[in-house]
Regions:
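Beta-lactam-recognizing serine transpeptidase/beta-lactamase-like catalytic domain environment
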Residues: 2-64, 69-169
């Protein structure tokens, strides 16, 4: 499914929220895809998925969308400047893992701004290392990432972030 929230970043006011699949308020017990031959149990499971507000009730690992958080935290902490240069060979090895950039051959030399534009994993791994665990958690706290948004919608899930003491241990 798809979930989208559009909100005012200054005060958290929600302008729009949508979940897909969605349901008709006039026919809440009608599945979107009626072509399936489902048992009663399967139909109930599908209805519960359809009625669930995944925007606030589900948790996700954010992937590359979290790079804006890393960027903000690093710039605020002075761990990086816009013109700092980095080198992307196409991957970076962390412990026993090869973490790849989406550009297999690498971006080569690039500034921080170019690394953001390219969503370059090796650049962001270096930025995260410069920032350190404490700096990253400080930035996340300042941006409210580690707590509920406390919006006026029932069923908001808690964060799934690791505790700071367990990161890098």
């Amino acid at each position: 499914g798809v979930r989208v929230i559009m909100m005012n970043p200054q005060n958290g006011e929600i302008y729009a929220m949508v979940n897909s699949p969605e349901f008709s308020l006039t026919k809440p017990y009608e599945l979107v895809d009626q072509s399936k031959n489902l048992s009663e149990k399967q139909k109930n499971e599908e209805l519960n998925k359809m009625w669930r507000n995944g925007c606030v009730s589900d948790t996700y690992e954010p992937g590359s969308t979290f790079k804006i958080i890393t960027s903000t935290a690093a710039l605020e902490a002075g761990a990086v400047s816009l013109n700092d240069t980095f080198y992307c060979p196409g991957f970076k090895i962390v412990e026993d893992r090869r973490i790849r950039c989406h550009k297999a051959g690498g971006h080569g030399s690039e500034t921080f701004v170019q690394g953001v534009q390219n969503s370059c994993n090796p650049v962001f791994m270096e930025v995260g290392a410069r920032l350190g665990v404490g700096g990253m958690f400080r930035g996340m706290r300042q941006l409210g990432i580690l707590s509920k948004a406390n919006i006026d919608v029932p069923g908001e899930a808690s964060t799934i972030m690791h505790q700071q003491k367990n990161v890098g241990a």
